[in-house]
Amino acid sequence: MARELCEVQGLIFKRKKYKEADVLTKIMTKDHGIFTIDVRGALRPKSRLGAATLNFSYGKYIVNTNWKGISTLRTFKDVKQLDQLYLDLTKNAYSSYVLDLLDHAFVEYKDIGSFYDLIIKALLKINSGEDAAIITQMVQLKLLNAYGVAPQLDRCLICGKVQGKFDYSLELGGIICSDHFNSVSQRMHLDPKVVALIRTLALVDIDRLGKIKINPQLKKDSGKVIDRMYVNYLDLNLKTKKFLDELALF
């Protein structure tokens, strides 16, 4: 396939040195998925391309590509940066993990569909100071769909009940209503409030997530359950997740 110049709308992440003065960076795009671009001369002093491809920069990028392998950045326009994600260590850690999860869910150049808007909205919320942990938990739950291991959280696995108190079963991959607690041995015996929060984050659109304050212990408990889902269903062992967990210890 011949190479062509194409304008893509996207966000830059995962930047690393390549050759003497170049960098390779990943870009998450609205219509062409995630792929790698070679930013030539990015490490040279006063490089315009380098400044426009710092992590968490977003805008329109003109690339030379044949839609496989490494594409090459030619120029850009209307580029801005989510500066708080770049400057604030905690926001950076959460955002890097969110993007890493997305990156591992798709092969390069595959359309990521509605997940583009989900991630952009999540990053904008984190950048503006909203609860990064809760936003990340929401993205974690929704991205399980991209991995093909989404649990059933909208209704009881046994009877289909949608309201009431629920528990969760890792083995069965979904929620159990209180009518069937005694008939299911493989449940986690969670506080119903934890399950309710997880259900809300999984089922509600991110646009409806306002600036809410969640009890710190409840937020911690829901995070542990979601982490167990990822370990049981995927076991990704991402460096960004390990760093985020280490950061939480301080």
Swiss-Prot record:
Keyword flag Transferase: no
InterPro entries the record matches: ARFGAP/RecO (IPR037278), DNA_rep/recomb_RecO_N (IPR022572), NA-bd_OB-fold (IPR012340), RecO (IPR003717), RecO_C (IPR042242)
KW DNA repair (keyword) present: yes
GO cellular component terms listed in the entry, alphabetical order: bacterial nucleoid
Cross-referenced SUPFAM superfamilies: ArfGap/RecO-like zinc finger, Nucleic acid-binding proteins
Entry keyword set: DNA damage, DNA recombination, DNA repair
GO terms, biological process: DNA recombination; double-strand break repair
Similarity-based family: Belongs to the RecO family.
Function: Involved in DNA repair and RecF pathway recombination.
Protein name according to UniProt: DNA repair protein RecO
Source organism phylogeny: Bacteria, Bacillati, Bacillota, Bacilli, Lactobacillales
